[in-house]
From Swiss-Prot:
GO terms for molecular function: mRNA binding; structural constituent of ribosome. The gene is rplM. This is Large ribosomal subunit protein uL13. Belongs to the universal ribosomal protein uL13 family. This protein is one of the early assembly proteins of the 50S ribosomal subunit, although it is not seen to bind rRNA by itself. It is important during the early stages of 50S assembly. GO terms for cellular component: cytosolic large ribosomal subunit. NCBIfam families: rplM_bact.
Amino acid sequence: MSTFMAKAEDVERKWYVIDAADKPLGRVASEAARLLRGKHKPIFTPHVDTGDHVIIINAEKVALTGKKLTQKLYYHHSRYPGGMTLINYGTLLKTRPERAVEKAIKGMLPKNRLGEQMYRKLNVYKGEAHPHQAQKPEAWTIRD
Protein backbone atom coordinates (compact mmCIF):
# COMPACT_ATOMS: atom_id res chain seq x y z
CA MET A 1 0.00 0.00 0.00
CA SER A 2 1.43 3.36 -0.98
CA THR A 3 1.04 6.76 0.64
CA PHE A 4 -1.79 8.89 -0.72
CA MET A 5 -0.70 12.07 -2.51
CA ALA A 6 -3.36 14.58 -3.47
CA LYS A 7 -3.39 16.12 -6.93
CA ALA A 8 -4.35 19.74 -7.52
CA GLU A 9 -7.25 18.79 -9.82
CA ASP A 10 -8.75 16.43 -7.20
CA VAL A 11 -9.10 19.13 -4.52
CA GLU A 12 -12.59 20.49 -3.83
CA ARG A 13 -12.27 24.04 -2.59
CA LYS A 14 -14.76 25.56 -0.17
CA TRP A 15 -15.22 29.16 0.89
CA TYR A 16 -15.02 30.11 4.56
CA VAL A 17 -15.77 33.43 6.23
CA ILE A 18 -14.06 34.42 9.48
CA ASP A 19 -15.36 37.29 11.63
CA ALA A 20 -12.30 38.99 13.16
CA ALA A 21 -14.27 41.33 15.45
CA ASP A 22 -12.78 41.30 18.98
CA LYS A 23 -10.61 38.26 18.19
CA PRO A 24 -6.81 38.29 18.75
CA LEU A 25 -4.86 38.95 15.56
CA GLY A 26 -2.63 35.89 16.00
CA ARG A 27 -5.57 33.51 16.44
CA VAL A 28 -7.32 34.87 13.34
CA ALA A 29 -4.10 34.72 11.31
CA SER A 30 -3.16 31.18 12.37
CA GLU A 31 -6.65 29.79 11.65
CA ALA A 32 -6.74 31.55 8.27
CA ALA A 33 -3.27 30.23 7.37
CA ARG A 34 -4.37 26.72 8.40
CA LEU A 35 -7.42 26.93 6.12
CA LEU A 36 -5.41 28.41 3.23
CA ARG A 37 -2.84 25.57 3.47
CA GLY A 38 -5.51 22.88 3.76
CA LYS A 39 -4.18 21.39 7.01
CA HIS A 40 -7.75 20.86 8.23
CA LYS A 41 -8.38 18.32 5.46
CA PRO A 42 -7.52 14.62 5.60
CA ILE A 43 -6.04 14.86 2.08
CA PHE A 44 -3.43 17.48 3.10
CA THR A 45 -0.28 17.11 1.03
CA PRO A 46 2.59 19.52 1.77
CA HIS A 47 3.67 20.06 -1.84
CA VAL A 48 0.13 20.56 -3.27
CA ASP A 49 -2.19 23.50 -2.70
CA THR A 50 -5.10 21.72 -0.99
CA GLY A 51 -6.40 24.80 0.81
CA ASP A 52 -9.70 26.64 0.67
CA HIS A 53 -10.70 30.24 0.02
CA VAL A 54 -10.87 32.44 3.12
CA ILE A 55 -12.81 35.68 3.60
CA ILE A 56 -12.04 37.76 6.68
CA ILE A 57 -14.52 40.45 7.68
CA ASN A 58 -14.31 43.19 10.34
CA ALA A 59 -10.53 43.54 10.02
CA GLU A 60 -10.73 46.99 11.62
CA LYS A 61 -12.10 45.46 14.85
CA VAL A 62 -9.32 42.90 15.37
CA ALA A 63 -7.93 42.82 18.91
CA LEU A 64 -4.33 43.13 20.06
CA THR A 65 -2.95 42.37 23.49
CA GLY A 66 -0.49 44.50 25.43
CA LYS A 67 1.01 47.67 23.94
CA LYS A 68 1.20 46.38 20.37
CA LEU A 69 -0.83 49.31 19.00
CA THR A 70 2.12 51.60 19.70
CA GLN A 71 5.10 49.23 19.91
CA LYS A 72 4.55 46.79 17.02
CA LEU A 73 6.26 48.16 13.90
CA TYR A 74 6.08 47.21 10.25
CA TYR A 75 9.11 47.90 8.08
CA HIS A 76 9.27 48.65 4.38
CA HIS A 77 12.31 49.61 2.34
CA SER A 78 12.35 51.13 -1.14
CA ARG A 79 15.93 49.87 -1.75
CA TYR A 80 17.15 53.44 -2.05
CA PRO A 81 19.52 54.92 0.54
CA GLY A 82 17.47 56.21 3.45
CA GLY A 83 14.36 54.56 2.03
CA MET A 84 13.23 52.66 5.12
CA THR A 85 9.68 53.38 6.22
CA LEU A 86 8.41 52.49 9.69
CA ILE A 87 4.72 52.41 10.59
CA ASN A 88 3.25 51.30 13.90
CA TYR A 89 0.25 49.02 14.09
CA GLY A 90 -2.09 51.72 15.43
CA THR A 91 -1.50 53.92 12.38
CA LEU A 92 -1.81 50.99 9.99
CA LEU A 93 -5.05 49.91 11.66
CA LYS A 94 -6.54 53.39 11.12
CA THR A 95 -5.42 53.79 7.51
CA ARG A 96 -5.52 50.24 6.05
CA PRO A 97 -6.80 47.65 8.54
CA GLU A 98 -7.06 44.90 5.94
CA ARG A 99 -3.34 45.23 5.13
CA ALA A 100 -2.35 44.60 8.76
CA VAL A 101 -4.30 41.33 8.83
CA GLU A 102 -2.93 40.30 5.42
CA LYS A 103 0.66 40.83 6.58
CA ALA A 104 0.11 38.69 9.68
CA ILE A 105 -1.36 35.84 7.60
CA LYS A 106 1.26 36.06 4.85
CA GLY A 107 3.99 35.62 7.47
CA MET A 108 2.45 32.27 8.43
CA LEU A 109 2.37 30.85 4.89
CA PRO A 110 5.26 29.12 3.07
CA LYS A 111 7.84 31.47 1.54
CA ASN A 112 7.75 30.05 -2.00
CA ARG A 113 5.52 29.88 -5.10
CA LEU A 114 3.09 27.58 -3.34
CA GLY A 115 2.71 30.14 -0.56
CA GLU A 116 1.94 32.83 -3.15
CA GLN A 117 -0.78 30.58 -4.61
CA MET A 118 -2.28 30.13 -1.17
CA TYR A 119 -2.11 33.86 -0.43
CA ARG A 120 -4.15 34.63 -3.57
CA LYS A 121 -7.11 32.77 -2.05
CA LEU A 122 -7.28 35.24 0.86
CA ASN A 123 -9.80 38.11 0.86
CA VAL A 124 -9.80 40.62 3.73
CA TYR A 125 -12.43 43.35 4.22
CA LYS A 126 -12.53 46.01 6.91
CA GLY A 127 -16.32 45.99 7.34
CA GLU A 128 -19.13 43.42 7.46
CA ALA A 129 -19.90 43.47 3.74
CA HIS A 130 -18.08 41.35 1.17
CA PRO A 131 -18.82 40.64 -2.53
CA HIS A 132 -18.57 36.84 -2.26
CA GLN A 133 -22.16 35.94 -1.32
CA ALA A 134 -22.57 33.97 -4.57
CA GLN A 135 -19.94 31.46 -3.39
CA LYS A 136 -22.08 30.67 -0.29
CA PRO A 137 -19.23 30.82 2.26
CA GLU A 138 -19.50 28.82 5.48
CA ALA A 139 -18.85 30.55 8.81
CA TRP A 140 -15.67 29.42 10.58
CA THR A 141 -15.50 30.07 14.31
CA ILE A 142 -12.29 31.00 16.09
CA ARG A 143 -11.72 29.49 19.51
CA ASP A 144 -11.22 32.00 22.33
